[in-house]
């Protein structure tokens, strides 16, 4: 299983769904082997959702972050 492609594909799917809201998720690797998930609105940082995750945790993290955004939008 290619973990890199799995989370990249999931990120792409969620960002397509979020596109109409102006929100998007962005994964950064500030330190080798550790990843952060940022939430952007119209390309501007809204919040750093999570920090210091391993690559094999990113699919769950992306799902949680997308749920976080959708819950916020549903208010």
Give residue spans per PLM region.
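Negatively charged, low-complexity tracts enriched in Asp/Glu with abundant Ser/Thr
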Residues: 1-24, 56-63, 67, 74-75
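Acidic, low-complexity, intrinsically disordered interaction modules
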Residues: 19-64
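A general structural signal for short secondary-structure boundary/capping elements
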Residues: 43, 72-73
